[in-house]
Amino acid sequence: MIVIEVFAPAGVLGPAQRQRLGERLIDALMGTEDAHAEAVMDSARALTQVLVHEPAAWITGDRRPVDPADPPRYLIRVGAPAAWRKEMSAHAIDRLTQALAETEAEAGRDPDRLRDQPHALVQVVGIAEGSLGMCGRPMGSLDLIQHMTAPHRDAIARLSTADLPPGTVIDPVCGMTVDLGTTDLTLEVDGTLHGFCNGQCRRIFADEHGVPLTA
């Protein structure tokens, strides 16, 4: 589960702009390159929420209120399981800044300033294991991946591999295509070599098949 909070000066974003920006931010964070199985991505989107805030006061470091006539400042705070933070930070900062820039361009403001000046701050905050709850109980990062992928495992197992590039396989947990030549995240089960996009998918698969992990 990921929560994206957007802080913007009052009046900068109208209702339609807030809705469009929220959709943009979710699409930007989920991405399209190297995507997991579509159904898994839909589950991830369903667990992603965007909240837009308009603070009553906005003071900058030079101790003056933000002037409504100035180009608007933004703060985006992304809360995600701590185990995901390091891997997702660079991607999130780049993509979310771009989503804001597209919104600025639509409003007739200079989108390039968001990369040239510190007008868009992005914080990726890792939530400690056991500190995120859903369905009335704590949910760790492994629990969330399990929740998002479990309903789709049978469909992932039936995905055709006929058109895959040589040396690649489909991650049996999330459906991502994995290059066996560039990863050591593999497991052999019943004579079949499986590859995984990250260690958590590998851990889930190993636990479900009773395979001990030595590394």
Task: Show where each model-derived region lies.
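Short, hydrophobic beta-strand segments
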Residues: 2-9, 72-84
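Short, non-transmembrane amphipathic alpha-helical segments
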Residues: 21-33, 92-112
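Short, solvent-exposed beta-alpha or beta-beta edge segments that form flexible loop/patches at the rim
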Residues: 46-70
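Short, low-complexity, polybasic intrinsically disordered segments
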Residues: 60-67, 130-153
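Short linker/helix segments within small regulatory modules
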Residues: 184-193
